[in-house]
From Swiss-Prot:
A double ring-shaped homohexamer of HslV is capped on each side by a ring-shaped HslU homohexamer. The assembly of the HslU/HslV complex is dependent on binding of ATP. It is found in: Cytoplasm. The keyword Amino-acid biosynthesis does not apply. This is ATP-dependent protease ATPase subunit HslU. The keyword Ion transport does not apply. Coiled coil: none annotated. GO terms for molecular function: ATP binding; ATP hydrolysis activity; peptidase activity; proteasome-activating activity. GO terms for cellular component: HslUV protease complex. It comes from Listeria welshimeri serovar 6b (strain ATCC 35897 / DSM 20650 / CCUG 15529 / CIP 8149 / NCTC 11857 / SLCC 5334 / V8). The gene is hslU.
Amino acid sequence: MTNLTLMNQLTPKQIVEKLDQYIIGQTGAKKSVAVALRNRYRRQLMDESIRDEIIPKNILMIGPTGVGKTEIARRIAKIVRAPFSKVEATKFTEVGYVGRDVESMVRDLVEVSVRLVKEEKMQLVRVKAEKNAEKRLIKLLAPSQKKKQTTTQNPIEALFGGMNQSEETTEEEVDQELKNKRSQIEWRLQNGELDDEIVTVEVKEQQNPMLDMMRGAGMDQMNGMQDALSGMFPAKKKKRKVTVREAKKILFEDEASKLIDADELAAEGIHRAEQMGMIFIDEIDKIASKEGGGNAQVSREGVQRDILPIVEGSQISTKYGTVNTEYILFIAAGAFHMSKPSDLIPELQGRFPIRIELDKLTQEDFYKILTEPDNALIKQYKALLKTEGIDLIFTKEAVERIAEIAFQVNQDSDNIGARRLHTILEKLLEDLLFEAPEINMESIKVTENYVNEKLAPIMKNKDLTQFIL
């Protein structure tokens, strides 16, 4: 099912309901993002003459850390399978300085988009690819003894690992004994009897980790150079010993890739990134210019001016082709404790017409976060201890006390929102998680007294609270 079909089936109200399964409160932010998403679907249904005139209304989320800014954007992208990329504004530097190039956010989005399209296309060819992979695996487990000796055609091929890729003869003479052996292996393979056997397969060599390190350090241009060079020479392969279970996955991916048209994949990936892509720019308040900032202010303003043309709409070169950013939805977010949205340069402010202020979390919100969402923290810890055969039970009073402590600590020290619950629950269940394998009990009940016993001593000492909770 394509993301356009998913968007067709989901109204803004239904999108908000789905977000409610994971995120507590922040109804205003959920509504704005749901409407922005639905407008993208509406735009796809319009005549071409008017469609190009309608651009997404970018969103600026304002609120403290841990209230759900990133999670809203990430969840909504998952719901409709839209390409989504999260970047931090502080990682970028002005053109000419060491740091990440602002255009890398678009390249990251296209990578995500192409991967999504590839996953969908792999599902379409799954049956044929699995059949081809199984045939190759059977031949690896029962190879023919009548192979022709392959020779290297020229020194250039030897240099770049260009040996003959085929491991079989052009016309393999398979005798009856080999046929019977392969037939038995096929039956055992399909029944999972050989999953733990070891087999040797050829796999593509992984990219040099040094290139990834340089890219992370801001040398994004190295990525383009590497892609250009990789296209000139065939990919080097090496032999690896893996289990049959793992070999199935490796060979399936290889066979599926052969059945997918690379040019079509790139074109569709770019189109989806352009029309459905979402880029979340976090910590945008950290690059807001403040009065009397000196050189730092100039640098921050430079990053804003570099981001501006991408948000306005420009052509960005990627290894898959040129991407037009005009119709990508940008969601920026920041706490704005030390600055205001008006501290951003006017041109950038104008590109984020929808402003949403997210609410601070209340004690009641903390209680709901612990219990209501599908991925609620308490449910996660219950599942963790269930693997040890222990049924973990929290009383209502215990959960209320945990919520109260989280709210109180946020009030007394730095407000880190819902992330405070992770710290408190880890401290609360620390001993239990450590001793769980040796505990011979089917169930353990966490009561209000237990919470007080574990956390009260820390709560009484302000210094300890700041360092531990």
